[in-house]
Structures are given as C-alpha cells and as structure tokens.
Amino acid sequence: MYAKFDQTKAPLIIIEFTGEKANAQNFAHYLRSLEENYAREEQIALVFDARKALDLNPLYQMKQAHWLRKNKALIERYCQGVAYVVPNSFLRTMLGLVFKIQPNPVPFKVFENLDAGLVWAASQLEAQ
C-alpha cells in the first residue's frame, strides 16, 4: 500500500505515505482514494504525511499534476487547505516541481512535523 487514508478525524483527512515504492497499481489506487475524499461533497482539509515517503518517480509526479488539473474545480469547491508534512528537503523540492507543472488550487503550507500540519489544517476548516 502506497498511502493510507485516515478519515477518523473527518473533515480533517490524513494521508500517510507508507514508504512503499510507487508502482502503476498502487499509485492508481492512491489517486482513486484521493478522489473518494470528495464524494460526500463536504468541506475538507487534507494533511499529507510524507515522513516515510520515498522519492517520487517523475512519471508519478506528472500523474499527480494531471490529477490536480483534472480535479481542480472539485478541489477548489470542497478543500479548505492542504498541509504537507515533508521533513526531507529533497522531497520538498520534488513537491515544488509538481506545483510548477500544476499549481495547487487551494491554500497550502509545508511543515516539517505532523502536529504543526494538523493544527494548520484544522484552522483552515475553522476559517470557512
């Protein structure tokens, strides 16, 4: 499993990257699961926990950027903000490359620790 989705704190949703290397099957499952977060058509905030994430192949960077572009209207309508927990500076650079291909359509912030990301994401929901 490439990523686990924790909805126990919904509408605050935590996506934890497991450290498993991305492949065609698990990355497609990740993108489908990401889209399912919007199925309720309710306001949400996302926290991407990339503390265990591995480097992302450029092919999957492009797929992520395409997913953002394809779902831009859905994201803008329901997502109040996205916190990225990325302690690894190389992965932060890769995240920046994804956003150069397709800018993030909602407010976002990058954090080095999970607690700070959770607090910020919760505040985005409260601000709605």
Residue ranges and their predicted role:
Residues 1-128:
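Amphipathic, Lys/Arg-enriched alpha-helical "gate/interface" segment within cytosolic domains
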